[in-house]
């Protein structure tokens, strides 16, 4: 009975941590990263198609992303999709390839991004605490229903707290690494 509660919080907290890591991949750090292009969908002959299925993507330099559509006629559609994606990058097109130049971030912009990343970390910590609260409610209900003893309930709450602390610590570690990456020149 208790193992199900533990498995459920491990699974939910693990997913929350993965979502946080994926959200951070999309944050611009001043370095070129193909993760910036994740989620860009191109209207290709009326069909919404992910960018990575229409072109080869590469990072030849630390501040440059090169997009080479396999179909040269799609270059305008790719360019339009990048502009609509609101990633604060302006594509330059030479007819064959699209280049996205990543400008260096100003110190103010770096601090602003770091603040936004901190806010994202806090939101995910709140999600972890909500999962903990739900697990504790489940334990309380199990005790009330007579499924577990009071000792098991206390031990269960203690284990739930330890798991929560562990995941919150991991969110902090991921946040600190990203913050360092953002703030270093």
Swiss-Prot record:
Primary location: cytoplasm
Subcellular localization(s) per the UniProt record: Cytoplasm
Coiled-coil annotated residue ranges, if any: none
Organism: Desulfosudis oleivorans (strain DSM 6200 / JCM 39069 / Hxd3)
Name of this chain's protein: Ribosome-recycling factor
Biological function: Responsible for the release of ribosomes from messenger RNA at the termination of protein biosynthesis. May increase the efficiency of translation by recycling ribosomes from one round of translation to another.
Molecular-function annotations in GO: ribosomal large subunit binding
HAMAP family named in the record: RRF (MF_00040)
UniProt keyword annotations, A-Z: Cytoplasm, Protein biosynthesis
One GO process term, biological-process aspect: translational termination
Family recorded in the similarity comment: Belongs to the RRF family.
Pfam families the UniProt entry points to: RRF (PF01765)
Record keyword Transcription regulation present: no
GO cellular component, one term: cytoplasm
Keyword Cytoplasm: yes
């Amino acid at each position: 009975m208790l193992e199900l509660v533990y498995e459920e919080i491990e699974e939910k907290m693990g997913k929350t941590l993965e979502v946080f890591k994926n959200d951070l991949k999309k944050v611009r750090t001043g370095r070129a990263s193909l993760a910036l292009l994740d989620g860009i969908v191109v209207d290709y002959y009326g069909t919404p198609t992910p960018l990575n299925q229409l072109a080869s993507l590469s990072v030849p330099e630390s501040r440059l992303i090169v997009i080479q559509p396999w179909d040269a006629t799609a270059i305008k559609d790719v360019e339009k999709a990048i502009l609509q994606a609101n990633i604060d990058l302006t594509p330059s097109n030479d007819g064959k390839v699209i280049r996205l130049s990543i400008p260096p971030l100003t110190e103010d912009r770096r601090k602003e991004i770091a603040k936004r990343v901190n806010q994202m970390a806090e939101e995910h910590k709140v999600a972890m605490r909500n999962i903990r609260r739900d697990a504790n409610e489940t334990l309380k209900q199990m005790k009330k229903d007579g499924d577990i003893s009071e000792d098991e309930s206390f031990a269960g709450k203690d284990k739930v707290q330890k798991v929560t602390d562990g995941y919150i610590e991991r969110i902090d570690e991921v946040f600190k690494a990203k913050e360092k990456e953002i703030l270093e020149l």
